[in-house]
Amino acid sequence: MTLEINFDGLIGPTHNYAGLSLGNIASHSNAGAVSSPRAAALQGLTKMRTLLDLGLTQGFLPPPPRPAAHVLRRLGFKGSDQAVLAQVADEDLDLLRAASSASSMWTANAATVLAAPDTADGRVHLVTANLGTMLHRSLEADDTYATLRRVFSGEAFAVHAPLPFAAHLGDEGAANHMRLAANHGARGVNVFVHGAPRGGRFPERQALRASQAAARLAGVQPTALFAMQSAEAIKAGAFHNDVVAVANANVLLAHPQAFATRPDLLAELSARLPGLVVIETRDLSLEDAVASYLFNSQLVSLPDGYMALIVPVEARDNAAAWREIQTILAADNPVTKVKVVDLRQSMSNGGGPACLRLRVPVAAAARDQINPAFLLDHARLDRLTRLVETWWPRAIAPSDLTDPALWEAAMVAHAALETFLTAPTV
């Protein structure tokens, strides 16, 4: 039996609101606000608990060390971690902000995952995203690659290095990829969504060439579909496809303006996948879709064969979005349950439930090859929660990013997390 494991990003101890992400309306709207790293991480852990309580398998990916002194040394800064960070704080504050970002929490951007039934060699392929469009995100790529190799080291997995960093190869991972299939173990249709051609108001975060490369590396290109995100969606603030569309098994939930070539895409999907269920929200504006992050919900398969939507509180608080959710629940489709989660700390930086997780479909044999340190049950989740409550800072103001005390606190928190990861799991 094949199941899907959600690997959520643990929100790191330097979570802050530096407003680093062009095209991300929430990020810019909240730039300069005081963040709460401890509350942010606890909110994420509560979401993980919600999935466990639904009977699903849950994993997590740890944040890389931040501030990233190890990366800054590659730029010529020398000395101890504290000395390196002090130099950067004095010479290039924007670079320090980028090196302090906790944006690795959004593991939907960690990699593109291609399921074993679809790939040329029958392995699960993870193509690490280069995240080359944004400086702060690009600093994650090598760390993410190392983490993925640590988690998925078995022969059932193929973890690919990030694509070369180039203007026309920007790759932002699973946030721009959807897989549709009769079930997680069946052969599926991989849909790669890329941005509009360069020259618009916001940057092309996902390049067509990058999507083609990911498909080629996993051997799914001959059967893959490539669709362009609509310019209207991007202008409205949908900087990734997962802000306007989400798919699970044979269900596609999408805004009618999500794709530039919607009729052709839906026709091709219907032809390839008998039993496809398309749910479109015809009474929800793009503005409400982005404000509520309805489509950035997690759509998950439940043990009883039905599906649940994991939505942010913003979707409940937006009247138009909540009406659409009730309509979905009342209609004839597999979605029978909705769970509301509070992710305000992440949402204020533009990341909802779907941003915070990387979906990895695995058969039983492959699951046994996953490093157990990164899988959670309720007891391990309790331990991780206590760790965050002990070591994560309560608050970070913009000026705190230059404070050596914060750098030291973050290093201590990361050391405690590494101790958790290397301790026996049974």
UniProtKB/Swiss-Prot annotation:
<feature type="binding site">
    <location>
        <begin position="18"/>
        <end position="27"/>
    </location>
    <ligand>
        <name>substrate</name>
    </ligand>
</feature>
<feature type="binding site">
    <location>
        <position position="349"/>
    </location>
    <ligand>
        <name>substrate</name>
    </ligand>
</feature>
<comment type="pathway">
    <text>Amino-acid degradation; L-arginine degradation via AST pathway; L-glutamate and succinate from L-arginine: step 2/5.</text>
</comment>
<feature type="binding site">
    <location>
        <position position="109"/>
    </location>
    <ligand>
        <name>substrate</name>
    </ligand>
</feature>
<comment type="similarity">
    <text>Belongs to the succinylarginine dihydrolase family.</text>
</comment>
<keyword id="KW-0056">Arginine metabolism</keyword>
<keyword id="KW-0378">Hydrolase</keyword>
<dbReference type="GO" id="GO:0019544">
    <property type="term" value="P:arginine catabolic process to glutamate"/>
</dbReference>
<feature type="binding site">
    <location>
        <position position="242"/>
    </location>
    <ligand>
        <name>substrate</name>
    </ligand>
</feature>
<dbReference type="Pfam" id="PF04996">
    <property type="entry name" value="AstB"/>
</dbReference>
<dbReference type="GO" id="GO:0009015">
    <property type="term" value="F:N-succinylarginine dihydrolase activity"/>
</dbReference>
<comment type="function">
    <text>Catalyzes the hydrolysis of N(2)-succinylarginine into N(2)-succinylornithine, ammonia and CO(2).</text>
</comment>
<feature type="binding site">
    <location>
        <begin position="136"/>
        <end position="137"/>
    </location>
    <ligand>
        <name>substrate</name>
    </ligand>
</feature>
<feature type="active site" description="Nucleophile">
    <location>
        <position position="355"/>
    </location>
</feature>
<dbReference type="InterPro" id="IPR007079">
    <property type="entry name" value="SuccinylArg_d-Hdrlase_AstB"/>
</dbReference>
<feature type="active site">
    <location>
        <position position="240"/>
    </location>
</feature>
<dbReference type="GO" id="GO:0019545">
    <property type="term" value="P:arginine catabolic process to succinate"/>
</dbReference>
<feature type="binding site">
    <location>
        <position position="205"/>
    </location>
    <ligand>
        <name>substrate</name>
    </ligand>
</feature>
<feature type="active site">
    <location>
        <position position="172"/>
    </location>
</feature>
<dbReference type="InterPro" id="IPR037031">
    <property type="entry name" value="AstB_sf"/>
</dbReference>
<comment type="subunit">
    <text>Homodimer.</text>
</comment>
<protein>
    <recommendedName>
        <fullName>N-succinylarginine dihydrolase 1</fullName>
        <ecNumber>3.5.3.23</ecNumber>
    </recommendedName>
</protein>
